[in-house]
Design a protein with these regions (language model features):
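C-terminal alpha-helical interaction module
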Residues: 1-410
């Protein structure tokens, strides 16, 4: 994208951050300039006071009773808010397996080529982080991977069977680890390591094929260990890549803090909320954080979060942004604005990563993404209908939605 076009997009972005002029996703400059944070919160408050569902106010006794009926249901693996939790807040589970692959002498898990396997889901943004860094660092021959089927049922993530024809993608295969031939679900991997495991059966899972145990199931830690742990064995072009550089560590950690809470996890806290108050609070925080991210990109000039250096922040933010318009806008009700028409710089940033870096594009599978959310979360979408749009899932680099085109010509 040329300099003039980038400058024009920055101008549009600056205008958007200063004003959100209507009750719908809006692109353009209003006569009154208000801060985006204030606008988000005032807008949510006004909706809360007026919204009705089927002619019934969301805060009416009838609607409160309906909410009570929902929380009295028995707990299931697909209950994202614990039944009986009156807060309505989604609370993410802390990962249980936290060992590291290490180059230290005598390490329990040394960096041996071919020893480790990565279980992922193309649908899962947390797992996608690990696939991205694996490809960026040229670790394809060092760590094998396989993807589960996109569907999550009562037993959690399932492995595809040879008969499955609805989950196309690289390495979407039955469990390939020796000894796991009869496994049908990722839960069996967890139980093989700890028969008493009582947590969620999440991905990614970094598995040691030599000792038949789980090394780590925390995506941020897997990302960080793969950043350097195999460098001694890699060609120079890959070994030199550092996504957690010393001069930027403090800034990276600061960004991780609010991006994780407000955006990465914010979409889930909005979408899985079971009370209006929890939804209002979290969706407002989400869009405040998106506004902050848009402002940051305007200040830095791109193409990456820290200007011309690709870091962990980009690897962790991208999976959420690429899912935003296809899924989170409609499925998680994150619909104050979308990315492609409401955030010009975040839109450009996401497309730059996708179209210019195979590690980002090749690990994005829109079929798995859209089908998983819309057909697994039956408490949100009971008929499992998958919307056709947006079309396309991601726009080409130099194409804009009509509203942005109009803004660029002003």
């Amino acid at each position: 994208m040329n300099t003039a076009r980038s400058s024009a997009l920055s101008t549009v972005a600056s205008s958007l951050l200063l004003s959100r002029s209507t009750r719908f996703t809006s692109l353009f400059i209003s006569s009154k300039r208000r801060s985006s944070t204030s606008w988000n919160r005032k807008y949510i408050t006004s909706l809360r006071n007026t919204t009705q569902i089927g002619g019934v106010s969301v805060n009416s006794p009838l609607n409160v009773a309906r909410q009570g009926q929902q929380v009295r249901m028995a707990s299931k693996i697909t209950d994202w808010v614990k039944p009986g939790d009156s807060s309505g807040e989604f609370k993410r589970q802390v990962s249980s397996f936290r060992d590291w692959i290490s180059k230290e002498p005598g390490a329990k898990f040394p960096p041996e080529k071919g020893r480790y396997h990565l279980y992922v889901s193309y649908a899962c943004p947390w797992a996608t982080r690990t696939l991205i860094v694996r490809k960026l660092k040229g670790l394809e021959d060092f760590i094998s991977f396989s993807s589960v089927h996109w569907h999550m049922g009562e037993k959690g993530w399932c492995f595809p069977t040879p008969e499955d024809t609805d989950a196309a993608g690289e390495n979407v295969i039955p469990d390939p680890v020796p000894g796991h031939e009869k496994y049908t679900h990722i839960r069996e991997v967890y139980f093989s390591v700890d028969p008493n495991y009582g947590g969620r059966f999440t991905v990614p899972v970094l598995f040691d094929k030599k000792t038949n145990t789980i090394v780590n199931n925390e995506s941020s830690e897997i990302l960080r260990m793969l950043n350097h742990v195999f460098d001694d064995q890699l060609p120079a072009e890959y070994a030199k890549l550092d996504f957690y550089p010393e001069p930027l560590k403090t800034q990276i950690e600061e960004a991780h803090g609010w991006i994780y809470d407000g955006i990465n996890n914010g979409v889930y806290k909005s979408g899985f909320a079971t009370t209006q108050e929890a939804y209002d609070r979290n969706v407002t925080t989400l869009f405040d954080a998106l506004d902050k991210a848009e402002k940051h990109l305007a200040e830095m000039g791109g193409p990456y979060w820290f200007g011309d250096q690709l870091t962990e922040v980009d690897i962790r933010l991208f999976p959420t942004l690429i899912r935003f318009d296809p899924v989170y806008v409609q499925h998680f009700k994150c619909n104050l604005r979308d990315i492609r028409s409401g955030y010009p710089l975040l839109h450009k940033y996401t497309r730059d990563l996708y179209w210019k870096h195979p590690a980002f594009k090749d690990t994005t599978n829109f079929l798995h993404i859209k089908n998983h959310y819309t057909r697994s979360h039956t408490q949100i979408n009971p008929h499992s209908i998958t919307p056709l749009g947006p079309v396309p899932d991601i726009l080409p680099l130099d194409e804009e939605v009509n509203a942005v085109k109009a803004a660029l010509t002003k």
